[in-house]
C-alpha cells in the first residue's frame, strides 16, 4: 500500500523496507528479508488463515443482510506456456467491500466446482448471494439455500431451456408487470436500468428442479453517450429466491460492484495482471494482500470525506510520509 504496485514478492520486500523507516519503525534485527524469503513464506502460508487474520484485525462489521457477490478473475501474468493462468474465485461483500473467502482454480471452467466448496466455508446465513451465469447451476443454488441465504443469479445460454422459457414469457407478458426504473449520470453518459420481477412461476416447468426458486427477473440497461447521443441497450435475465422488486434490483446493482470496485482496481491500481507469482499459495496470498489494501484505502477515503481523492494519490502520500501510512493502517489511532 505504500507503493504504486503490489505485483510480487519483491514489492512486498520494498514495502517492508519502507516501513522499517520513520514512525512505523518495524524492527528487523537480522536485516530486512530478501524477496526470496518472502517468496518462500507466501508459497507455504495458508491463504485462508492470512485472510481471516487480516480481516479480523480490521474488524469490519457486516450488515445483517448483505449482498455477497461471487465472481472469478483470471490472473493473466501467473500463467506461462507450461502452466495455465490461475483463476481466483472471490466472495465479496458489496456494502463493506470485504472479502469473505477465495479459492484458486487452474482453469476458469473449474469455477463451477469451486463455488459450492467456497460457500460451505463462509457464513452467508441471511445474506443475498449474487453471481454471473457461470454459477447458474442447480448444485450451487442448493448450497446457497442450504446455507440459509437467498440468491439472484444471472441466466444465460449455459441453461438453454430455462433461458428460452424465461425469455419467451417476458417477451409475451413482460409489459403486464410494474417495473422499477433507475437513472444514473456520470462518466459522460446517462444510464437507465429497468427491473422486472415475476414471482408467479407456476407456468415454469423446471421450477421444482431449482432449490429455493421463487421468481425470475429481467433487467434492461440503456446507455446514452452524452456527447454523441449514441445509445446501446441490453437485456439480462435472472433466477432468484427473492420476492421483493426493490431488493432484487438492489442486489443486481450491487453485484456489478465486484467488477467496478474490486477487479478493475486490482488491475489498474495494483497491476495484478502483471504479477508473475505462480507457485503454490503465492498467487492467492498476494491477492489477499491487495484486497485488504484496497479496503483500507477505500475506508480511509470514506471516513475522511474525501470522495474526490484517488487511491493512487493516497498511495503516493503513504509512500512519501509514514504518518500518512499510519493514518490509513490505524484510522482510529490518536
Model-flagged regions — what are they?
Residues 100-188:
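Nuclease catalytic cores that cleave nucleic-acid phosphodiester bonds
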Residues 8-11, 53-56, 179-183, 262-268, ...:
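Short coil/turn segments at secondary-structure boundaries
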Residues 215-297:
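A C-terminal functional module that forms or caps the active site or interfaces directly
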Residues 16, 265-334:
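A short, flexible helix-boundary coil/loop motif
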Residues 6, 35, 47, 51, ...:
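Alpha-helix initiation and N-capping motif
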Amino acid at each position: 500500500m505504500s507503493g504504486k504496485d503490489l505485483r510480487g514478492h519483491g514489492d512486498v520486500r520494498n514495502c517492508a523496507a519502507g516501513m522499517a523507516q520513520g514512525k512505523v519503525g518495524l524492527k528487523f534485527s537480522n536485516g530486512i528479508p530478501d524477496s526470496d524469503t518472502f517468496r518462500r513464506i507466501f508459497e507455504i502460508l495458508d491463504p485462508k488463515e492470512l485472510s481471516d487474520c487480516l480481516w479480523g484485525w480490521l474488524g469490519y462489521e457486516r450488515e445483517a443482510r448483505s449482498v455477497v457477490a461471487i465472481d472469478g478473475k483470471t490472473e493473466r501474468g501467473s500463467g506461462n506456456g507450461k502452466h495455465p493462468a490461475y483463476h481466483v474465485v472471490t466472495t465479496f461483500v458489496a456494502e463493506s467491500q470485504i472479502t469473505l473467502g477465495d479459492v484458486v482454480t487452474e482453469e476458469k471452467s473449474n469455477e463451477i466446482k469451486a463455488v459450492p466448496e467456497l460457500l460451505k466455508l463462509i457464513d452467508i446465513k441471511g445474506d443475498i448471494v449474487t453471481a454471473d451465469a457461470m454459477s447458474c447451476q442447480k448444485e450451487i443454488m442448493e448450497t446457497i439455500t442450504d446455507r440459509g441465504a437467498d440468491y439472484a443469479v444471472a441466466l444465460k445460454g449455459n441453461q438453454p431451456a430455462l433461458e428460452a422459457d424465461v425469455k419467451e414469457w417476458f417477451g409475451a407478458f413482460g409489459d403486464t408487470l410494474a417495473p422499477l426504473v433507475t437513472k444514473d449520470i456520470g462518466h459522460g453518459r446517462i444510464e437507465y436500468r429497468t427491473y422486472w420481477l415475476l414471482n408467479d412461476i407456476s407456468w415454469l416447468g423446471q421450477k421444482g428442479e431449482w432449490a429455493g426458486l421463487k421468481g425470475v427477473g429481467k433487467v434492461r440497461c440503456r446507455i446514452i453517450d452524452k456527447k454523441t447521443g449514441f445509445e446501446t441497450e441490453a437485456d439480462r435475465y435472472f433466477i432468484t429466491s427473492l420476492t421483493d422488486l426493490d431488493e432484487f434490483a438492489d442486489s443486481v446493482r450491487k453485484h456489478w460492484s465486484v467488477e467496478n470496485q474490486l477487479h478493475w482496481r486490482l488491475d489498474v491500481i495494483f497491476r495484478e495482471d502483471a504479477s508473475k507469482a505462480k507457485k503454490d499459495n503465492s498467487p492467492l496470498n498476494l491477492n489477499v494482500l491487495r484486497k485488504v489494501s484496497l479496503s483500507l484505502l477505500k475506508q480511509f477515503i470514506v471516513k475522511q470525506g474525501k470522495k474526490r481523492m484517488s487511491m493512487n494519490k493516497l498511495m503516493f502520500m503513504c509512500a512519501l510520509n509514514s504518518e500518512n501510512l499510519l493514518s490509513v493502517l490505524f484510522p482510529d489511532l490518536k
